[in-house]
Curated annotation (Swiss-Prot):
It holds the Pfam family SBP_bac_3. It is found in: Cell outer membrane. The lineage of its organism: Bacteria, Pseudomonadati, Pseudomonadota, Gammaproteobacteria, Pasteurellales. InterPro entries: Lysozyme-like_dom_sf (IPR023346), MltF (IPR023703), Solute-binding_3/MltF_N (IPR001638), Transglyc_AS (IPR000189), Transglycosylase_SLT_dom_1 (IPR008258). This is Membrane-bound lytic murein transglycosylase F. One of its GO terms (biological process) is cell wall macromolecule catabolic process. The gene is mltF.
Length: 483
């Protein structure tokens, strides 16, 4: 009997030990598996982000960015409210995800094997790579061994685990970190020659080159990797299933394509000379006419009206083309008479008439076209005529596309110059390929003005707070050297 009791006690103790070992895991699993239910119960989706010019920012028109638009759509998909929580860097963001302070980490984060062991991942929505950058005209680095101590990165950057892994095969690799500058600010410091090298994500570098064209890529630090959301870790998660379902839905409905078109497509074309000339004009010429663009902007942002005028005339009120169009907005004589202006070379008259004419065209665009795309339809009509815009909408429908989807319409613009297509259209031949490029150029110019202003304002603020480059990121400083 004593032996039986002893065995029972021993067995019970073993059971308690096993329960103690398993219970925390069960608790964790319970919490993770219920994360989706928690979101539904509180009716709030908490998404962690880092302020960033492509991912998440608050601009003149309100909150925007790739991650914001995706997260907002996901919250709508779940029928809950979106709560954005911002962090200074990726390290803080992942710490918050681990501590259950956010439900999703969304900050233009590339897939990393180390992180996938700690967190669940969602579907990829674009891909990018880490690259080493230097100032155009200075010594270009070609390999890791040339970076010794001269590489500056932000503290808490997502690239740190990558550098630590690379150091295993490259023992001389070293870098310095700074708490005082963001990744974008370090890219700009490279452009100004204040620091020799930094790293950035390829799409961020492309965006930065449109405001600082002397930023150049030395070499790829990594291969291209998917950009995705990170979720709390567990062996199974309803939240992960919901994210995967949403991303499939976003692909099928064209949401991902529309977001890529909005934030990425205008970055594909990079002309060093053109951008240099444009940035010079922003500094020297634009201030003369900015008040007029603001005065006559109507429903547009004044920066958009300025971008149109630059595409038309490079902000030259006396510009003339061989076809007879003249002035800041390059108006035809017929359009000038229609808009009741007497002097096409008057900057004010031309800007006013051009804006009013564009607004008139946009009012004719069907209400079924989404609000954010109406400007692109209007610009295409401004360039080639409203009749040809109607034609390309008809052609898009004939070819199985959606005439209310700018992505579908714009790819068919060049077809207006092909006889097999224009011969069956009401308004016939049009130089649709020019209209396509016209809209793309304006998108690029508009983005550059917005980003140039944002960077200038940030630099003024930084100069007031920090008049010189802090010692913490100077080459002489050893206090921040990280291995």
């Amino acid at each position: 009997m004593k032996g039986l009791i002893a065995r029972f006690i021993a067995g019970f103790a073993l059971l308690l030990w096993a329960w103690d070992m398993v219970f925390p895991w069960q608790q964790l699993m319970q919490a993770e598996e219920n994360r989706y239910n928690q979101i539904q119960q509180r009716k709030i989706l908490r998404v962690g982000m880092v302020n960033h010019p492509l991912s998440y920012f608050i601009g003149a028109e309100g909150t925007a960015g790739i991650e914001y638009e995706l997260a907002k759509s996901f919250a709508n998909y779940l029928d809950v409210r979106l709560d954005i929580k911002t962090f200074d860097n990726s390290e803080q963001l992942f710490s918050a995800l681990k501590d259950n302070k956010v439900d999703i980490a969304a900050a233009g984060l590339l897939y990393q094997p180390e992180l996938s062991k700690q967190f669940q991942i969602g579907s990829a929505y674009y891909s990018a790579s880490w690259q080493v950058v230097y100032k155009k005209g200075s010594n270009r680095p070609y390999k890791l061994s040339e970076l010794e101590g001269d590489l500056i990165i932000p503290a808490g950057s997502a690239v740190l685990p990558i550098l630590q892994r690379l150091k295993e095969d490259n023992p001389k690799l070293s870098w310095q970190t700074t708490n005082q500058f963001t990744q974008e600010e370090l890219l700009l410091q490279v452009a100004e020659g204040k620091i020799p090298y930094t790293v950035g994500i390829s799409v961020d570098i492309s965006a930065a080159q449109h405001i600082r064209p002397n930023i150049a890529v030395g070499f790829d630090l990594t291969d291209e990797a998917p950009v995705l959301w990170y979720l709390p870790n567990s062996s199974y998660s309803e939240l992960q299933a919901a994210v995967l379902d949403f991303m499939n839905h976003a692909n099928e409905t064209g949401l991902i394509s529309r977001i890529e078109e909005k934030y990425f497509n205008h970055l594909a074309h990079f002309d060093y000379v053109d951008i240099q000339s444009y940035l010079k004009a922003i500094k020297l010429v634009l201030p003369k006419y900015q008040s007029l663009f603001e005065k006559y902007r109507g429903d547009l942002e004044w920066q958009m009206l300025a971008a149109i005028a630059y595409q038309e005339s490079h902000w030259d009120p006396n510009a003339t083309s061989p076809t007879g169009v003249r002035g800041m907005m390059m108006l035809t004589r017929d359009t000038a008479e229609r808009m009741k202006i007497t002097d096409r070379t008057s900057a004010e008259q031309s800007i006013r008439a051009g804006s009013e004419y564009l607004h008139m065209l946009m009012r004719q665009i069907p209400e079924t076209v989404p609000k954010e795309d109406r400007i692109w339809y209007g610009l295409a009509a401004y360039n080639m005529g409203f009749g040809h815009l109607l034609d390309v909408r008809r052609l898009t429908r004939q070819l199985g596309g959606n005439p209310d989807n700018w992505l579908d319409v714009k790819k068919n613009l060049p077809l207006l110059a092909e006889k097999r297509h224009y011969s069956g259209l009401k308004y016939g031949y049009a130089r649709g390929f020019e209209a396509f490029q016209y809209v793309e150029n304006i998108r690029r110019y508009y983005s550059s003005i917005i980003n140039h202003q944002r960077v200038e304002e940030q630099q003024i603020q930084n100069n007031e707070e920090q008049p010189s480059v802090p010692q913490e990121i100077s080459k002489e400083s050893d206090s921040t050297l990280k291995e």
